[in-house]
Amino acid sequence: MSVPEPKAALERLHHWAQLTPLHVALRHKRQGQWHAWRWIDVLRDVGRLADGLRQQGFSEQSRLALSGAFEPNLLLLALAAQSVGGQVLTLADDLEPQALEQQLWRLHPSHACVQGRQPDWTFTQRLDFAQLLGPVDPVQRLQRWWQSGAETVLWSEEGTHWQGGLAVVLEQWLDSGHGLAFPETQASARRDRSEVAPTGLLLSPERLQHLADEIESRLAAHGTWRRRLCDWAIAHPHSGLRRLLKNRVRKLLGFQRLGYIWQPLKTTAEPIWLVEFKRDIA
């Protein structure tokens, strides 16, 4: 899947780096600690990565294949490749090694960056992010604490398995100028999300359904009096019990500040919890 509109994305990046250079643009939890990139940091890193790509022979005729979880390194590298004028492609990050190699062989990109896998493919040039970026002091990125309740924060816990997702995340992030946060891993997503308490979600329909299943698993079993009480509360929108239950679920999932949920223009049937949250937001 190609990532479109590189010129517009880069223009927005320059805009925010000039308008709010010291505001936090990206956050990512690494080894249990939150790291932050300001807009000026993002612009500088994209420039350094672009120089690194050129040194690796990347040009306007080149194509970069990316595969992995959405996090700052992946977004920065995508923007750097676009700034050089090359094309960015994404491959699902949940492919088996053989299937991934077959996809790369079929697409035949000039360069590839695949998280967590280090095979040497003879038909494409594998890139190393740290080598492209050059020396950097990780302490500069370390953010030991911040008060999330005072700012607008978008949240994504996806990867390149979300077809078209990278374009969505880049567009929503760069158009809004809000900070964007990512969990350390999929397994730690709920815990990390609760720490951030995001105001906006950038998730695929599949991930939204996963959250619906998580909510369902935490409710009482069907047929029990506790579940009948929950169902009654949901059916009576003005009851205090309904508000109590919803607030508890919101806090459990880290949605106590949620005010925006991205969705494609054409959507299938929505999970009940999503309908309820959207009703509250409206």
Residue ranges and their predicted role:
Residues 4-26, 44:
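A short N-terminal helical cap/helix-turn-helix that marks the beginning
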Residues 26-57, 69-71, 138:
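Conserved AMP-binding/adenylate-forming core of the ANL superfamily
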Residues 35, 51-94, 155-160, 241, 245-282:
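Conserved AMP-binding/adenylate-forming
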Residues 58-63, 148-151, 256-257:
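Short helix-loop-beta connector
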Residues 78, 89, 93-121, 137-155, ...:
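Conserved ATP-dependent adenylate/AMP-binding module captured primarily in the ANL superfamily
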Residues 139-153, 160-247, 276-278:
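Conserved AMP-binding/adenylation subdomain of ANL enzymes
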